[in-house]
Amino acid sequence: MPNEVYDVTIIGGGPIGLFSAFYSGLRSMKTKIIDAEPDVGGKVRYFFPEKIIRDIGGIPAITGANLVANLKEQAETFHPTIVCNERVVDVTKLTDGVFQLTSHNGSIHFSKTVVIATGSGTFEVNKLEAMHVDDFPLAINYDVKNLEQFRDKIVTVSGGGNSAIDWAQTLEPIAKKVHLIYRGEDFKAHEESVRELKNSRVEIHIHHEIKELIGANNQLASIKICCNQTQVTKTIETEALFINHGVKVDLGTMAEWGFELADFGIVVDDEMKTTVPGIFACGDSATYSRKIRIIAAGLHEGPIAINSAKKYLEPTARDEAMISTHHESFIG
């Protein structure tokens, strides 16, 4: 039913959006998820399917793909409507208080409340810029679907953040050799990850950038890197590249939706309320003082946003859902 009105529509089907959908089911809210990508899972599905995630309480280690699969299964407990391949470009509050959401393809959705869980927005990876980069498309990787493609190869990872360091360490026991190229000196990563990296067999090249790819017949053989302090170049043998230079994020038309934005997202209060009544935000979409940007924190913010949406609809409703072990859906 195209004109069906939902209690809550969650924009974004990443980990936080999926868990928010599960929690909204605990609150007996009719729920829809709208995601711009072909499938739910967000950046975790796209960038980290084989990366080991360790910063969620009670889960010592899990791959990104398995985390997304578990969250999707959990989200589907209460049968939310899931719409993919639609990017929401406009949210308008109608005279009756219902929000009209318009997608890039012209589709219209109606909802009494909206929870924004789009992360940093839609994203596009920053591509490697170097001589002959177009000659070796199969050797350049921006995400990893299968670690086995790197087995017994000489691999170079380029980047200096958590993801680049994690991938270098993940590839170390699989690849024949791993190089890590970073244009800076101080890695922008967790202290323990940096310590482990420096104690590993990964060969680190700080203050270096990739300048040229060398090979024949579309087969990469080596790369030329340059020190940005001395301008001295050197060539290192490399069969595969993993590039982690961050992403270009696009909040799209959100700036026109009426709520307050800051440098790192949508401004919310401690109830995940935006400055527009009825619209809430959580996960990397939201920003507030002393925010922690890890999945575990977002999994906490999602239920807060849903509870606020529930109270917006029903001011006399309980402040929070009954814990799942006591919920009627899981008893008997």
From Swiss-Prot:
It catalyses: 2 reduced [2Fe-2S]-[ferredoxin] + NADP(+) + H(+) = 2 oxidized [2Fe-2S]-[ferredoxin] + NADPH. InterPro entries: FAD/NAD-bd_sf (IPR036188), FAD/NAD-binding_dom (IPR023753), Fd--NADP_Rdtase_type_2 (IPR022890), Ferredoxin-NADP_redctase_2 (IPR050097). One of its GO terms (molecular function) is NADP binding. FAD binds at D35, K43, F48, V88, F123, D284, T325. Binds 1 FAD per subunit. Its EC number is 1.18.1.2. The keyword Calcium does not apply. It comes from the Bacteria. Keywords: FAD, Flavoprotein, NADP, Oxidoreductase. Pfam families: Pyr_redox_2 (PF07992). Its cofactor is FAD. Belongs to the ferredoxin--NADP reductase type 2 family. Homodimer. This is Ferredoxin--NADP reductase 1. The lineage of its organism: Bacteria, Bacillati, Bacillota, Bacilli, Bacillales.
